[in-house]
Amino acid sequence: MSRQKVYLALSADILHHGHINIFNKASELGDVIVGLLTDEAIAEHKRLPFLEFDQRKVIVENIKGVVEVIEQNTWSYRENLYRLKPDFVVHGDDWKSGYQERYRNEAATILSEWGGKVVDIPYTKDVNSSDISKAINQIGTTSSFRLKSLRSCLLYTSDA
């Protein structure tokens, strides 16, 4: 008997433990196929990714439970859903509102055509990629932050 097909789409530019939770929950439902957003798709709603598509693909291909990684060229799941006809689409429940809500609704409507379901995983509240991205940018670009870090390093080394 073949396992059920689970589709999960993401950018995977900055992965954190909340994403791993989603991968784990998805793999409990069946074979996980990841629709990896292209650089162009990410740039539609966010910034350009830190890592290029091929780099992100290698990372995701090596996550436990992932059986395949394919391109997702837009934020809409439509094209890949009709091609794959998965039993489930798994996503963090943060897409129930905001700019992603329309993509969730579209996915649910398409999945209903063959009895598929959207599975919303409770969002990991203590971490998100946007905050991590901001912190990375602050570390790399804010001179006052760099000076403060340097001062801390100098104080630490002078105490040693």
Give the predicted meaning of each segment.
Residues 40-45:
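A short acidic, helix-capping loop that chelates divalent metal ions and anchors anionic groups
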Residues 16, 32, 60, 90, ...:
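Divalent metal-coordination and catalytic microenvironments
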Residues 29, 57-75:
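Short acidic amphipathic segments
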Residues 2, 73-155:
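Classical nucleotidyltransferase
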Residues 2-36:
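N-terminal catalytic cores of NTP/NDP-binding nucleotidyl/phosphoryl-transfer enzymes
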Residues 156-160:
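Conserved small/polar residues in nucleotide/adenosyl-binding loops
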Residues 30-31, 64, 85, 115:
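Residue-level detector of structured alpha->beta connecting loops
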Residues 11-13, 39, 94-96:
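Short glycine-rich anion-binding loops that position phosphate/pyrophosphate groups of nucleotides
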